[in-house]
C-alpha cells in the first residue's frame, strides 16, 4: 500500500486532493481492485422484474489504474446493461457483472439497471458487450435523444408504446381463396385419383401372375440356376458363368471398393487442416479412426498466470502486436475453491492458436511482463 501511494504521489495526479477514505486499504481492494477511486455512486438492479428482488451496487465516477510502466491513468467509470466498467484505451474492463448475480438471485436471467431516473434495458439484437461502444457514463446528466441511440444498449424511459406493425399483424383477416388456390386443389385431387388407379391395376397384375401355376415357377427356377448373374434391367446374361469369370468379377468388385475408399474425404487430413477445429466431437463420429482424425484438429493454447492488471495490459498490447498469430484471447479469470468462493492463486489468461506452428512462433517472439509465467496445453472446445 505504501508503494502504491508513493507511486501515485509522483504521478500527475498526486497534486489532486485526496482523503483518508479514498486512500484506505479497503477502498483500494474494493472492485476494481488495486485501483484508486473517487466519486462513489449507488445504482439499483432489479432482477426478474420483481420490485422486491433489487440489488444495490456501488460504482465509481473516476478510476485511477496503474500501467506496466508504473504510470497512472485517470478514466471515467461507465455502466451499461452488462455491468460497470472502465476503459483501458479501447478495452472494456468490467469490475461488476450483473449476469453473475442474475444467475444467483434471479430465475429468468432478465434484469433492469436503474441509474438515477433512467432504466437500461437489454438490447434486442445482441446481449454481448461490444468493445468500446454502447457505454453510458455513470456521472453524466440525462442525455439527449441522439446520444441514447446506442448500438449494444439503449437507455429509455419506463413507458413504451408498442409498435403499430404488431397491431396490424394480429388484426389482419384471412384472405379468401383465389382462383389459383382452387386450381391447385383440383390438380391435387386428380393426382390422388391417378395414384389410386395405378395401385389398383398393379395389385390386379400381381394376383394374375400368382395364378400362373407351378410350370412358370419351375421354368423360372431353371433359368435362375443356369444364369445367376442379372443385369440392371432384370435380363439374364449369355450362358452360365465360369470359374474364371467369377474371379474377374470378384477382382473388379474389390477394385471398385478400393477406389471408393480412396476417394472418400474421410481418408485423412492435410497438414494445413491440423489445428483448424475449435469444437469437440459430436455423436456422429462412432469410429475410432474418425475420432482420431477429428481430434487432430484440436487447437493448442497457452495459459498465462500473473497479476490481473498486468495480464489485461498485455492482452491489450498483444492484440495489436500479435494479431496474425493469436486466434482468441480470454478474459482474466481465477480458480475458486470447491467449498468457497475465495479466489485461489493468481489470475489466468488463455491464448488460443490455430496450429502448433503459430504457437511456437509466438513463444519465440513474445515478451511477457515481469511476474507472469506460462504453460502449454490443448482444449477440446473453445
UniProtKB/Swiss-Prot annotation:
Q: Locations of Polar residues compositional bias?
A: 146-156
Q: Which Pfam families match?
A: PPV_E2_C, PPV_E2_N
Q: Gene3D superfamilies per the record?
A: 3.30.70.330, Papillomavirus E2 early protein domain
List the InterPro entries.
E2/EBNA1_C_sf, Nucleotide-bd_a/b_plait_sf, Papillomavirus_E2_C, PPV_E2_N, Reg_prot_E2, Regulatory_protein_E2_N, Regulatory_protein_E2_N_2
Record bears the keyword DNA damage: no
Q: How is it modified after translation?
A: Phosphorylated.
Subunit-level organization: Binds DNA as homodimer. Interacts with protein E1; this interaction greatly increases E1 DNA-binding activity. Interacts with protein L1; this interaction enhances E2-dependent replication and transcription activation. Interacts with protein L2; this interaction inhibits E2 transcriptional activity but not DNA replication function E2. Interacts with protein E7; this interaction inhibits E7 oncogenic activity. Interacts with host TAF1; this interaction modulates E2-dependent transcriptional regulation. Interacts with host BRD4; this interaction mediates E2 transcriptional activation function.
Q: What is this protein called?
A: Regulatory protein E2
Please report the organism this UniProt entry assigns to the protein: Human papillomavirus 15
Amino acid at each position: 500500500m505504501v508503494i502504491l501511494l508513493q507511486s501515485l504521489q509522483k504521478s500527475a495526479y498526486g497534486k489532486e486532493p485526496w482523503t483518508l477514505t479514498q486512500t484506505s486499504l479497503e477502498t483500494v481492494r474494493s472492485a476494481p481492485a488495486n485501483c484508486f477511486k473517487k466519486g462513489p455512486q449507488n445504482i439499483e438492479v432489479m432482477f426478474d422484474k420483481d420490485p422486491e428482488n433489487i440489488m444495490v451496487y456501488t460504482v465509481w465516477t473516476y478510476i485511477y489504474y496503474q500501467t506496466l510502466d508504473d504510470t497512472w491513468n485517470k478514466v471515467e467509470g461507465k455502466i451499461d446493461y452488462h455491468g460497470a466498467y472502465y476503459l483501458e484505451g479501447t478495452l472494456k474492463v468490467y469490475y461488476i457483472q450483473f449476469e453473475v448475480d442474475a444467475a444467483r438471485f434471479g430465475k429468468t436471467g432478465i434484469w433492469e439497471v436503474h441509474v438515477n431516473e433512467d432504466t437500461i434495458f437489454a438490447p434486442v439484437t445482441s446481449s454481448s458487450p461490444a468493445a468500446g461502444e454502447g457505454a453510458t457514463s455513470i456521472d453524466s446528466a440525462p442525455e439527449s435523444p441522439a446520444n441514447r441511440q446506442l448500438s449494444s444498449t439503449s437507455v429509455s424511459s419506463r413507458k413504451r408504446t408498442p409498435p403499430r406493425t404488431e397491431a396490424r399483424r394480429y388484426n389482419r383477416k384471412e384472405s379468401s381463396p383465389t382462383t389459383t388456390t382452387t386450381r391447385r386443389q383440383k390438380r391435387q385431387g386428380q393426382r390422388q385419383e391417378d395414384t389410386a388407379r395405378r395401385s389398383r391395376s398393379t395389385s390386379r397384375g400381381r394376383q394374375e401372375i400368382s395364378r400362373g401355376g407351378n410350370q412358370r415357377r419351375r421354368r423360372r427356377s431353371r433359368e435362375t440356376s443356369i444364369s445367376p448373374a442379372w443385369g440392371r434391367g432384370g435380363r439374364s446374361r449369355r450362358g452360365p458363368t465360369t470359374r474364371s469369370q467369377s474371379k474377374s468379377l470378384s477382382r473388379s468388385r474389390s477394385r471398385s471398393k478400393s477406389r471408393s475408399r480412396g476417394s472418400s474425404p474421410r481418408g485423412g487430413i492435410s497438414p494445413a487442416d491440423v489445428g483448424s477445429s475449435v469444437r469437440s466431437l459430436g455423436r456422429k463420429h462412432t469410429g475410432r479412426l474418425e475420432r482420431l482424425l477429428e481430434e487432430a484438429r484440436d487447437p493448442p493454447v497457452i495459459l498465462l498466470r500473473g497479476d490481473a492488471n498486468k495480464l489485461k495490459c498485455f492482452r491489450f498490447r498483444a492484440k495489436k502486436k500479435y494479431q496474425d498469430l493469436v486466434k482468441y484471447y480470454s478474459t482474466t479469470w481465477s480458480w475458486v475453491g470447491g467449498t468457497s468462493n475465495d479466489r485461489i492463486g493468481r489470475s489466468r489468461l488463455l491464448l488460443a492458436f490455430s496450429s502448433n506452428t503459430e504457437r511456437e512462433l509466438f513463444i519465440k517472439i513474445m515478451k511477457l511482463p515481469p511476474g507472469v509465467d506460462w504453460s502449454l496445453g490443448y482444449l477440446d472446445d473453445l
